[in-house]
């Protein structure tokens, strides 16, 4: 099998979710692009500029370690189990297929590429290219030096038409598109459960209810409480390893509950919800993506929203996902960015990594909350909240760097993750550049 190198074409802007995360790291279904290719045994590595290499290497290693621990018994020789070699940042394999991480490229698409061929979308954006030897090495070197990969001369070649099923995303609201979200979840569920060993496939316990004809995949280590309802009328449900669904919770498919995540008693998890690893979720959520390691464990509504890592939403936090006028939602993803039409009547919020919202926080429709925000004001969060805003009823100021880093280190340690020097440097640089 030809290995895959993932790249970010620089054309995406997920607002605060793009501050610390490349496109291959973003959870777009149950998985990220990097996780998909890792589980398929095809990922040789990722490409990025030299300035981001140390932080990207740290996060990639963390992803590899997490998946290796979850699927350690799966033979790497199988096309959908494990990975034969440890992926790296800016590696130089003899031959590889360069894959644009924001496109939903499948293994069969990669295998169909002939040596030297490329695939572009109707707008000319590079989707994938198969290269080897000196040509491939020159591409990796150029990207490490900061050059945009799609413009590299080695990638200008005849391009066949992209497969009809190929979808892509550029903005947060694209990730919540129902048809594309359903498609990604279905593919991810098939990939994930194919990596489980026979002994890891559990069943819905007798004290819970499975309603609907869709599949429920319960990992043998998942804990399902009394009177839990798993409703697959709208699509399948996956309860991944060591997750916990407490008594009388209702989950409506398609939905994914990630490893070691916790769904509180009486919670309602509505369709098209992807809860990444080590999250705590309660209240009512629907059409949401939690990147991972975030808390919304208490009551409150969160809908049509994307939440980064290391986020805490205090008890009673609620968001609006529909304007009183029922009009199309427009968003400004960053303070300096233009207003953009989302094409959606329902659009809640985008919450950046390391954000903390106090109890009772109200989030208005179409709000973008910047990385590292600490919101403890009684007024609603609305519009665009600048990164590293410290907001109280006395006004807004910037988060103090040392205090922010100390809090981040403490929060990450609660989930046995260390804030290493490269990631700390990335956070401090982002804070220093905040307006």
Predicted regions and their residues:
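Extracellular beta-strand scaffolds
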Residues: 216, 236-237, 245, 251, ...
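Glycine-rich hexapeptide-repeat left-handed beta-helix
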Residues: 25, 265-266, 272, 278-435
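Short glycine-rich loop/turn motifs
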Residues: 225-227, 234, 276-278, 284-285
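Acidic surface patches and DE-rich sequence motifs
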Residues: 121, 219, 240, 298, ...
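All-beta strand scaffolds that present successive hydrophobic residues in beta-strands
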Residues: 217-219, 224-225, 238-240, 245, ...
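Pre-Walker A segment
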Residues: 195-236, 251-252
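Terminal amphipathic alpha-helical/low-complexity segments used for targeting or macromolecular assembly
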Residues: 1-213, 387-435
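Membrane-embedded translocation segments of transport machinery
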Residues: 250, 256-262, 268
């Amino acid at each position: 099998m030809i290995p895959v190198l993932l790249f970010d074409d620089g054309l995406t802007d997920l607002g605060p979710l793009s501050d610390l995360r490349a496109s291959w790291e973003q959870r777009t279904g149950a998985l990220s692009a990097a996780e998909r290719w890792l589980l398929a045994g095809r990922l040789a590595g990722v490409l990025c500029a030299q300035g981001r290499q140390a932080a990207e290497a740290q996060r990639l290693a963390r992803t590899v370690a997490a998946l290796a621990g979850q699927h350690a018994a799966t033979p790497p020789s199988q096309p959908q189990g494990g990975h034969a070699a440890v992926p790296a940042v800016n590696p130089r394999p003899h031959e590889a297929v360069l894959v644009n991480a924001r496109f939903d490229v499948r293994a069969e698409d990669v295998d169909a590429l002939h040596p030297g061929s490329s695939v572009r979308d109707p707008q000319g954006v590079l989707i994938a290219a198969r290269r080897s030897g000196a040509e491939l090495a020159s591409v990796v070197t150029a990207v490490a030096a900061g050059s945009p990969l799609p413009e590299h001369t080695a990638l200008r070649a005849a391009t066949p038409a992209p497969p009809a099923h190929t979808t892509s995303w550029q903005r947060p609201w694209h990730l919540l598109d129902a048809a594309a979200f359903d498609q990604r979840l279905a593919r991810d569920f098939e990939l994930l459960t194919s990596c489980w060993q026979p002994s890891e496939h559990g069943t819905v316990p007798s004290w819970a209810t499975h309603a609907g004809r869709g599949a429920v995949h319960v990992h043998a280590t998942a804990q399902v409480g009394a009177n839990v309802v798993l409703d697959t009328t709208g699509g399948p449900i996956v309860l991944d390893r060591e997750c916990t669904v407490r008594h009388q919770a209702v989950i409506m498919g398609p939905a994914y509950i990630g490893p070691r995540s916790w769904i509180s008693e009486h919670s309602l998890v509505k369709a098209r919800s992807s809860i990444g690893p080590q999250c705590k979720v309660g209240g009512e959520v629907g059409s949401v993506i939690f990147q991972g390691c975030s808390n919304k464990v208490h009551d409150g509504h969160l809908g049509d929203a994307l939440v980064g890592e290391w986020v805490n939403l205090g008890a009673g936090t609620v968001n609006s996902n529909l304007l009183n006028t029922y009009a199309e939602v427009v968003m400004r993803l960053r303070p300096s960015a233009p207003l953009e039409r989302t094409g959606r009547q329902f659009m809640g919020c985008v919450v950046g990594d390391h954000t903390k919202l106090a109890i009772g926080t109200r989030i208005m429709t179409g709000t973008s909350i910047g990385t590292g925000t600490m919101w403890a004001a009684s007024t609603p969060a609305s519009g665009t909240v600048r990164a590293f805003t410290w907001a109280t009823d006395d006004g807004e100021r910037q988060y103090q760097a040392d205090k922010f880093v100390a809090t981040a280190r403490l929060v990450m340690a609660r989930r046995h993750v260390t804030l290493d020097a490269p990631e700390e440097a990335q956070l401090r640089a982002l804070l220093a550049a905040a307006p």
